[in-house]
C-alpha cells in the first residue's frame, strides 16, 4: 500500500469506499463506514482531522456495482419509517438526498404539533422533499407570519396538504414579512391576503420591489381609466385574478387588446376588467388574440355578425380561455343536436360543460320529450343537482 500525502491518498482499487472532500485533504475509507470500527485512516489525531474538515454539507459517494448508490442511509430509513414515497421524492428533488444534514424528524414533530396527521406529513415530504431542509427556527417564524393572515393552524395545514411548495419554497422570512406589511398597507384585507396565500402563494415569494411595481402600475391604470379610488381598484383586480402580480407588460398588452378589439371607452373597459373580464389580464396576450381570432372565424362561418361575436365574448369572457379545438368541438356538438347558433349566443355558459355532459344531457332531454329548438338551453350548464331536479319535473309533463 502506498503512503498517504496531505493532498491525496492512494489505495489499492476496490469497489466499496467513501470519498470525503475537505480543504486540502482527501481521504479514502473502506466499507461505507465513517469513523467506524472497521475503517482505517492515516495517523492523524481527531483534532487535526476536524480542523481540516469544514462543517458544511458534503457529498458521500457509495460505489456499488450491484445497486444504485444510496446517498444518506439514515435519511432513507427515517423517510421510509415516516411513510414517504421515496421514488416520488427522488424524482421531484433528487438533490435533497445528497445532503448529510436534514431535519425530517424536526419537521415531523413541528407539523404534528400543528395538527397535521402522519399521512399528511408523508404526502408533503413526498411531493416537496426540500421541506426537510428547513430548520425548526425557520419553520416556527414562517408559521407565525402565516398566522398573521390565516386564522388557524388547521387552515395552514390544509394549504400545505394541497400545495406544500407554497410554504416551503422559500426560507426568506424577512421578504415574506415585508410583503405582508406592504400588501396590508395598500388596503388589501386579511381575507384578500388569505386568498392570495391559498391560491397564489408565489406572490409572497416575489421580491418586495416587484410587488410594489405591480401595485403602483395597477393604481395608475385605475386612475387612467377614471377610477377614483386606486386602492379599491387594486383590491378588485387582485380578488378577481389572483395570479396577476407577475408582469406589468402582460397586463398593459391585454388592457390594450380589450380596448381596441371591442372598441370600449374607459368606463366600459373599467367595468369589464373589474368584473367578468379581469382574468383575461393575466392571460398570455398572444393566446388571447389567437383564441379570439378562432372564435370570430368559427362564428362568422355560422353566419354571425361582428356585433354578435363581440356581444357573445363580452357576455362570457371566459370563452377566451377555451382551447381552439375544444371551442370548435363544443359548438359542433350543440349544432349537431339541432341547437341553433343564436341559442348558443344568447346562452354562452353552455360551453362551461364538457362535451360528454352536453351529449348525455341532450339525450336525456330528448327522451323526456323536450324540443331543444325552443328550450332554454342554460340548464345544460347547471349543477348536477339542479339539472336532475329540472329533468325530473320535465319528465312528469312528457
Swiss-Prot record:
It comes from the Eukaryota. One of its GO terms (cellular component) is mitochondrial matrix. One of its GO terms (molecular function) is double-stranded DNA binding. Keywords: DNA-binding, Mitochondrion, Phosphoprotein, Repeat, Transcription, Transcription regulation, Transcription termination, Transit peptide. The keyword Zinc-finger does not apply. InterPro entries: MTERF (IPR003690), MTERF_sf (IPR038538). It is found in: Mitochondrion. Residues 1-57 form a transit peptide. PANTHER family: TRANSCRIPTION TERMINATION FACTOR 1, MITOCHONDRIAL (PTHR15437:SF2), TRANSCRIPTION TERMINATION FACTOR, MITOCHONDRIAL (PTHR15437). This is Transcription termination factor 1, mitochondrial. It comes from Pongo abelii (Sumatran orangutan). The gene is MTERF1.
Amino acid at each position: 500500500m502506498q503512503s498517504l500525502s496531505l493532498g491525496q491518498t492512494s489505495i489499492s482499487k476496490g469497489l466499496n469506499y467513501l470519498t470525503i472532500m475537505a480543504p486540502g485533504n482527501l481521504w479514502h475509507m473502506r466499507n461505507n463506514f465513517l469513523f467506524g470500527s472497521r475503517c482505517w485512516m492515516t495517523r492523524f489525531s481527531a483534532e487535526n482531522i476536524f480542523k481540516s474538515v469544514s462543517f458544511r454539507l458534503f457529498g458521500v459517494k457509495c460505489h456499488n456495482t450491484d445497486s444504485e448508490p444510496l446517498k444518506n442511509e439514515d435519511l432513507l430509513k427515517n423517510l421510509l419509517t415516516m411513510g414517504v414515497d421515496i421514488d416520488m421524492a427522488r424524482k421531484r428533488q433528487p438533490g435533497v438526498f445528497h445532503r448529510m444534514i436534514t431535519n425530517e424528524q424536526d419537521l415531523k414533530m413541528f407539523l404534528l404539533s400543528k395538527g397535521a396527521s402522519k399521512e399528511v406529513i408523508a404526502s408533503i415530504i413526498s411531493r416537496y422533499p426540500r421541506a426537510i431542509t428547513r430548520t425548526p427556527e425557520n419553520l416556527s417564524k414562517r408559521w407565525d407570519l402565516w398566522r398573521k393572515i390565516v386564522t388557524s393552524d388547521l387552515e395552514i395545514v390544509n394549504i400545505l396538504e394541497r400545495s406544500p411548495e407554497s410554504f416551503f419554497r422559500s426560507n426568506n422570512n424577512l421578504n415574506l414579512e415585508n410583503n405582508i406589511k406592504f400588501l396590508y398597507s395598500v388596503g388589501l384585507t386579511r381575507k384578500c391576503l388569505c386568498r392570495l396565500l391559498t391560491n397564489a402563494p408565489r406572490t409572497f415569494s416575489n421580491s418586495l420591489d416587484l410587488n410594489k411595481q405591480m401595485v403602483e402600475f395597477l393604481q395608475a391604470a385605475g386612475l387612467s381609466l377614471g377610477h377614483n379610488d386606486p386602492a379599491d381598484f387594486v383590491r378588485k383586480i387582485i380578488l378577481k385574478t389572483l395570479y396577476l402580480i407577475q408582469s406589468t407588460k402582460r397586463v398593459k398588452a391585454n388592457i390594450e387588446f380589450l380596448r381596441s378589439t371591442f372598441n370600449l371607452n374607459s368606463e366600459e373597459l373599467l367595468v369589464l376588467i373589474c368584473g367578468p373580464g379581469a382574468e383575461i389580464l393575466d392571460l398570455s396576450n398572444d393566446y388571447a388574440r389567437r383564441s379570439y381570432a378562432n372564435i370570430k372565424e368559427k362564428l362568422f362561418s355560422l353566419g354571425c355578425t361582428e356585433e354578435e361575436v363581440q356581444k357573445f365574448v363580452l357576455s362570457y369572457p371566459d370563452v377566451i380561455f377555451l382551447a381552439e379545438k375544444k371551442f370548435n368541438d363544443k359548438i359542433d356538438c350543440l349544432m349537431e343536436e339541432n341547437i341553433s347558433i343564436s341559442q348558443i349566443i344568447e346562452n354562452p355558459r353552455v360551453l362551461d360543460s364538457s362535451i360528454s355532459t352536453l351529449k348525455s344531457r341532450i339525450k336525456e332531454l330528448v327522451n323526456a320529450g323536450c324540443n331543444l329548438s325552443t328550450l332554454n338551453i342554460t340548464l345544460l350548464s347547471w349543477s348536477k343537482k339542479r339539472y336532475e331536479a329540472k329533468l325530473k319535473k320535465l319528465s312528469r309533463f312528457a
